[in-house]
Amino acid sequence: MSAEVMRSVIDAAEGRVPVDTLFTNAQIVDVYGQRVAPGSVAVKDGVIVGVLYDGRDDAAGTYEATEVIDCQGRYLAPGFIDGHLHIESSNIRPAEYARMAATRGTTTAIADSHEIANVAGLDGLRFMIEDGRRAPISIKYMMPSCVPALPDEQAGAVISAADMQAFFAEHPGDVFGLGEMMNLPGVFMADPETCARIDAANQTPSKQVDGHAPLVAGKDLNAYAAAGIIADHESTIPEEALDKLSRGMYVMLREGTCSHDLANLSPMLLENPARARRCCFATDDRAPSDALSTGMIDNACRVAIEVGVDPVVAISMASLSTAEAFGLDHGCRDPHELRGAIAPGKRADLLVLNDLTFATAPYRVYAAGALVAQDGTFVGEVAPETAEVAALADELCASVKLPKLSLDVFDYAFKPGEAVIDVVPGKAITGMARPENAEGLRRIMLIERHGRGVSLQAEGADGDGPAGLGLVGKHIGRGWVRGFTITGGAIASTIGHDSHNVCVVGDNAADMMAAVEAVGQGGHVLVRNGELVARIPLALGGLMSEGTAEDVAAQHDDFMVKARAMGIEPPLDPIMGIIFLPLPVIPTLRIRPEGMFDVTTFTYAD
């Protein structure tokens, strides 16, 4: 904090100059004192400069203010911080994501844009950063640490430690920290490149490294924590979460669209509520249809409260704990950077709440003192798109480069005893089975879409055979999945974590081929009996729509109805279900362009 800013804040805090806004008659959610107490809050230039509690501070008088907002006994809570998310997984661009998130009380997002980086490299990250500048909320971008997710993944880009360092030097302050470190073997083996990437975080404002450590324990967990990785959002059982807490890590309880881990982890908190100080919330991946209807971090608060967590504790986890994890809660810094609590010297991210159940959207949401949402409706401003953002967006609209494919590629037989993916609805993890027959199974394929297959075909990879067969096992993976009950057709998507090759699941070769052809330059598609019955277009990198959150939500709802009619029954989410099947960093069995991959052994499974 500069001396000039400090003097301005102090003068306002002492009441020597009028404040901009005074919130009165509020029930203040005090996350430091772990209480709710009546009082008033003064804001100047987007910063909280004064908090006065009724009774205790009556002698201090009040503040002269340009605007007085009577909260009429409503609760006043700190704005929510999403500790880990991928904006691209909401299928909307950052400025649109911010508009949506603001309506549900998220005023800060810690965003890892490794989705677009896996498609378009650092140019993709630049698009996210520049588009995010238009947002009325604060988006803190983390440098993707694992592009690709594994060294031999067939992604659209590679970001090395040297690339990171050059980007930090060229764009100082634009990246907040290092995103989730998914290369577990690289950490455990002290791989020089992996260590250099972790060390690169020292060039960022936060100097923090986010984590990704599903089922990691013992000496491996010791090594992971010793590397300086501060947090993890992959725990699915209380014992796993407690292991990480005990090693000094923050645990993010994930409540998204695909993964719902919060309730499973809650016994750890209920057994000892003091643990909540080192726990926070993350959505990771949240579809607009879910975000708009049931919420984001506010939904995590609701779920936590429903399973028995005290509301003030839940709000603290949604704000202060996350701020502490990333070093955003203290220090003699620009007060616009400090957040996570209603306290002097913090950014004025504030929620006015009718109650503490989170059954509905916040009554009002303020970001840096400005009203941005009321009763679930966005009322703030999103800045116009700049020429730079428009140019970067145009470059992202030609990202799908698929090889020529014949029907023969999609028509293959099941081999008794071969490794099959077992879908686990509501979880990012999968199982592995070795059935003796194909009953209940569906074909699954992953087709590289970043141009490698196209280049190999140009060199004659297929010989005189049908188009694409020469790429099988190299750039086209084929296998089987159980629990993905699509019937009479196929589903395909250009989203396939994290390299985002084209994934297709179906019960017949013809519809699978038609679905792959239908994805075009990006999107989710459903094909039934040769007919395209539903589509969500995602032109930006094959990941994001150019439309609004409401547009995508409506398309998603239609897609879900059509998918249910094709036999994909709850609790399996057809979109979230398919897009995580290629993810090679979460156990157990995954599909890659080379074939079926056992994450637990890092070997290909026959």
What are these regions (language model features)?
Residues M1-G39, K44, A102-R104, L292-G308, ...:
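Active-site microenvironment of metallo-dependent hydrolases
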Residues E14-R16, Q34-R35, G61-Y63, G132-R133, ...:
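Solvent-exposed alpha-helices and their adjacent loops that cap or buttress functional pockets
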Residues H86-E88, H114-I116, P144-A149, E180-P185, ...:
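Active-site beta-loop-alpha junctions enriched in small/polar residues
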Residues G124, A157-G179, G186-L253, H260-F281, ...:
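Histidine/acidic residue-rich metal-binding segments in metalloenzymes
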Residues V17-V19, Y63-T66, Q72, L76, ...:
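Short coil/turn connectors at secondary-structure junctions
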Residues S2-E4, V9, A95-S206, V533-R535:
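Divalent-metal coordination cores built from histidine and acidic residues
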